[in-house]
Amino acid sequence: MLTINLHGQPETEFSPFDWVTYRQTGRIQSITEGFAYIYFATEEGGILRYHTFQNQFDDPITQAQGLSSNNIRSLHFDRETGTLWVATKHSLDYSYTREGNWTSIPYGNLALPKNVHIRRIGSSPAYVWLDAGASYLKLDRVSGISLGVFTIPDEEKILWSSSRVLAGINIPEDIANYTVTEGWLLNGNQFLDPFGRTIDITSFYQTRFSDIWLGAGDGTLFLGDAQMETFYPFTFGLANSDITTFTKENDFWTAGRSGFTSGGITRFNPEELQFDLFDFEVTINMNDQSIYSSVDTGDEIWFGGEIGILVYKKKEKFWRLIDEAKGLPGGHIITMDHDTSHVWVGTSRGIARIHKDSKRSRLTGIEPFLHESFIYDIEVIEDQVWIGTSSQLYVYHQDQQALYDFRDMGDLSRISHQQDLLKNFWEIYEYKQWVYIASEKGLIAYDKKRGQWSMVFEKAHYSGRKINAMAFSDEYCFLGTNFGFDRIDLNRFFQRNYSYPFLGRVNDLFISDDVLWLGTNKGLTKFQWTKDF
């Protein structure tokens, strides 16, 4: 019996790449060649695609396109049918379009153990073959129906795609002496990276045009030029997949929770699909820590984490750490924003104002009042600093050097019956003449021109879930939660919920024209949101 698994795929009205997710790749596990693309199976990042005629990477194939998993064990392109076959941890997936419309067959339906490891996939003129180590499975190349299990294939002319090699690859002598650019060295069946670390070669493939591809254990890909006798390294993917924050300029700087694999910070150019990784393990002055907030001040990028703030000076290309010795109040740095001369820092234990040049705290007088307060969000709006905490919403007027309870400013008549019930002010967002605040009770707004407060909608519109991020575009409001996100029409209050498994927890949002960017615990996702009407 075949099972079509669409649990990770959006509705059919979406085109395959209306949703795209970028992740940490992990090891390169397998390589195959299609009509126009070289496909790379990765440990964590789905399938990477390199366009052989344009000589560039395109958007990857992940669960956002309908794959059953982002952990790809092996893959194979069947040239006779144009089908891309993919072995994941628990199922065999295939697609005739090689983009979307994926069919997933659990291994149990193929009379294979659920935890079988498919080492490689191949095809003969008539069938598709799976190498499961101790046995070989013959499949119908159109339907994927099992046609038998063999200890040895009953065909000889099987074209196999490359597989992951655990014991090391024996590099052919004619390429063993190739040079490698960008500070890498080829040493037998391993690479030495620019920092002196040994990186295993995990996959080898030679194309029909005699190009040579090597995949490495850290996700780096190497393209070999036979005429130049040179390998060129490529990096595609993020330093980690749990994205809690990203900056919103031309280049996105992404960061998140540190995990078991080496973490870091990524500079990502979405137009060129270029990734520059700053690895905690080897980058000077970078400390391994989870990052929860970021702000681009123009000359610098600030990242707030568990043990302090990492500051990157763009011109000097230099990192430094600001910690409690410079006046931080301690606790995880949850939020940051900046004015002309200072960066305002909110932590799980209070607030601080750090001078941009000296990198030291400059006291305002409000620090004792907010001591041990959980600061959810800070938004600098003109000469005011809006501060959302677990118990209260404050507005600090810098010119007056005075801290106000939000109830002490403006006309409260439209929320008078709810003003004393409001708490947990999670997110603050300025859009046009409005300041929007997401709270446990609902979304409230302050009209800066009229000085008037209003309740936009109550918590029922987002089922009482915690709001982690907000974004606005004309009449549309986007709310990121622990279970995807909601789009709400502020004129008609029509709600659209997006809770696909490949989204997970949405931590950060940004709208750039027709594209909604989402930082989630499953990666950095872009969505062509205006197509969904």
Predicted features along the sequence, with ranges:
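Carboxylate-rich, polar loop motifs that coordinate divalent cations or form catalytic acidic clusters
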Residues: 1-533
